[in-house]
């Protein structure tokens, strides 16, 4: 499930900006489709939905939502599945090979239903506030911050059970989530575990226009 909205505060309209000649949200969806799983874009924008239709990408229209995970939760009401992967629509460098690393780790969720898996990767410069850094000990993520607290960052993909998705959406936002503007802190603040899947990659999340230029130079 790929949540996408036009009203990004740092880069308005970025889902429809071009990556390698096609809209970024479509590029992300096509990467995800290469895993063989069913892929949907969930959005409150009819422009995004129309664009997805033109590329034969399945989409679900939702109301406005506070976070991408809240949007995925609403969209999943229409999908019969025990598990869900939330892939951010601004991660065009997350290839099917990298997504398959997350998928390979997902059987853990059959035995530990209170856990969420997120992608992580090493970074050389932790000073960029657009990158969400994470404190990783073993496979467990202990904290997320936009401050330079470690040399690992969170990558915009996470897997969980559908029941945990609903639980996540029902939990109140805590002070840490509000302060750091990192939604996965909600799970940690409420006493649950997040596991990091080291993708051992070098991806770029498109947060601002200059990121888009970097991504297109890499493709």
Question: Each predicted region: which residue ranges?
Answer:
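Conserved alpha/beta core of the MobA/IspD/sugar-nucleotide pyrophosphorylase nucleotidyltransferase superfamily
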Residues: 153-219
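A structural signal for short hydrophobic beta-strand segments in well-ordered beta-sheet cores
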Residues: 16, 134-136, 196
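Short phosphate-binding loop-to-helix
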Residues: 40, 46-104
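N-terminal glycine-rich phosphate-binding loop and ensuing alpha1 helix
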Residues: 1-43
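Short, high-confidence coil segments that cap the C-terminus of an alpha-helix
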Residues: 36, 81, 109-116, 192
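Residue-level detector of anion-binding/catalytic polar loops
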Residues: 38, 58, 191-195
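Conserved core of the sugar-phosphate nucleotidyltransferase
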Residues: 95-174
């Amino acid at each position: 499930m790929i949540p996408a909205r036009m009203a990004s505060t740092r880069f308005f309209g970025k889902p429809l900006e071009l990556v390698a000649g096609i809209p970024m949200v479509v590029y992300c969806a096509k990467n995800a489709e290469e895993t063989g799983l069913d892929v949907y874009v969930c959005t409150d924008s009819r422009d995004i939905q129309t664009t997805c239709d033109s590329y034969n990408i399945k989409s679900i229209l939702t109301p406005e939502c506070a976070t991408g995970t809240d949007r995925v939760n609403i969209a999943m009401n229409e999908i019969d599945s025990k598990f869900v992967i939330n892939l951010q629509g601004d991660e065009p460098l997350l290839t099917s090979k990298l997504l398959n690393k997350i998928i390979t780790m997902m059987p853990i969720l059959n035995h530990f239903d209170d856990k969420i898996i997120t992608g992580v990767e090493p970074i050389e410069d932790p000073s960029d506030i657009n990158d969400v850094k994470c404190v990783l000990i073993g496979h467990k993520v202990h904290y997320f911050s936009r401050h330079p607290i470690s040399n690992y960052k969170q990558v915009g993909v996470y897997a969980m059970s559908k029941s945990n998705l609903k639980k996540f959406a029902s939990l109140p936002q805590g002070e840490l989530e509000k302060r750091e503007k990192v939604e996965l802190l909600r799970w940690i603040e409420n006493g649950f575990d997040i596991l990091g899947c080291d993708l051992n990659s070098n991806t770029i999340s498109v947060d601002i226009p200059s990121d888009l230029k970097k991504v297109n130079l890499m493709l």
